[in-house]
Amino acid sequence: MSNLGKVIQIIGPIIDIKFDSENLPDLFNALEINAGDRKVIAEVEQHIGDDTIRAIAMEDTEGLKRGMEALDTGKSVSVPVGKEVLGRLFNVLGKPIDGAGEFISEESYPIHRPAPSFEEQSVEPEIFETGIKVIDLLAPYQKGGKIGLFGGAGVGKTVLIQELINNIAKEHGGLSVFTGVGERTREGNDLYYEMKESGVLEKTALVFGQMNEPPGARMRVALTGLTMSEYFRDQGQDVLLFIDNIFRFTQAGSEVSALLGRIPSAVGYQPTLATEMGALQERITSTKNGSITSVQAVYVPADDLTDPAPATTFAHLDATTVLSRSITELGIYPAVDPLESSSRMLDPRIIGEEHYEVAIKVKNILERYRELQDIIAILGIDELSEEDKLVVGRARKIQRFLSQPFTVAEQFTGMQGKYVPIKETVRGFKEILEGKHDNIPESAFLFQGTIEDVLKKAQQMEI
């Protein structure tokens, strides 16, 4: 027998509905409100008194009015999962929004699910090879880890994300789920068509809850993407989950919290900030079956890293990849800052002594070069000691060797993309540090894959 209630109050996206006190819907249950020509889905957030619930709408509340009937579905919002979701674009409710025809899925999962238990989780730290030299060498990713991607507008976040999707699909046979949380619709549109052109779309599912949507949708869309990822992980796959932008998840939660009448916490954020973030992040993990590696773009409000939203996010991250405008100005891409980026995987017990030593030496030489730049700017390079001149020469080669042509950018750069295994990356930088390539001009190191590519380029330059 269907459990029906009546809408008694609507304040923006918040809807109060009266049910029979014997049949009050459970928290997080999905409700269907019949608004004539369409059904509006809302989620139960609070019980008020004996017979009234307060729900947050997942869709626009335009056209709703008091007295309308609301049906308790008896379960939380469920979204389609399985290989059918690949190559398609969904909203928070798992409905396709790409206009690419009918969609039929055999299975669906509820978006509210428990995190894997301790017994199910994999505890062995394992490197996730990206094939991108600067990341693999200096700030390696953990399989099943969480990575924060920091960078302003136009420094190459999207291209880096696309290259990661491309590399996991082609080199590891892995899948990706891209979740757009509260970002610009135009950017999502661009990403969709760029992915289509570069051929990575069929290995990716996209879920969008953009900034024009109600706060309920923006708060839950990250869970929709995560649920699709969990299915693939449980099937033994390695999945890449992109969340762009994790700050908007917190922001939407703050809006919902205020609308529900909760007393705000520090800087006006919701009092449940850490709990909400933990509930999402704890589900992103490796199990004995497969892994979910998450790359999360992090917007830092007013560049204040102590703001509660980014500060709460930091507690969960295993690695940070910082994209820097000063590096894009040098014409070096990917514009990853080798000194600002960090990873807890940079440990000799995990990556091995050789890799660790090479990474630390590369960081040291780049740090020394940064210190010398002021002297060079004032006095010129000729005033440096012979030892410092050698350091500068090698640092400039290392800086250029950290650049790399990307497969997804081939149509723009005209250069063939390169995937570089970690062993080759470590060997290449070790040889530069040992001075084996001191005689090669630094321009030969720019946009090359392995050290062999550099030697080939140097030979061509001599001809």
UniProtKB/Swiss-Prot annotation:
Alphabetical UniProt keywords: ATP synthesis, ATP-binding, Cell membrane, CF(1), Hydrogen ion transport, Ion transport, Membrane, Nucleotide-binding, Translocase, Transport
Cellular compartments annotated: Cell membrane
EC number: 7.1.2.2
Gene3D superfamilies for this protein: 2.40.10.170, Bovine Mitochondrial F1-atpase, Atp Synthase Beta Chain, Chain D, domain 3, P-loop containing nucleotide triphosphate hydrolases
Keyword Electron transport: no
Residues that bind ATP: G151, G152, A153, G154, V155, G156, K157, T158
Subunit architecture: F-type ATPases have 2 components, CF(1) - the catalytic core - and CF(0) - the membrane proton channel. CF(1) has five subunits: alpha(3), beta(3), gamma(1), delta(1), epsilon(1). CF(0) has three main subunits: a(1), b(2) and c(9-12). The alpha and beta chains form an alternating ring which encloses part of the gamma chain. CF(1) is attached to CF(0) by a central stalk formed by the gamma and epsilon chains, while a peripheral stalk is formed by the delta and b chains.
PANTHER family noted in UniProt: ATP SYNTHASE, ATP SYNTHASE SUBUNIT BETA, MITOCHONDRIAL
Protein name as annotated: ATP synthase subunit beta
Encoding gene, per UniProt annotation: atpD
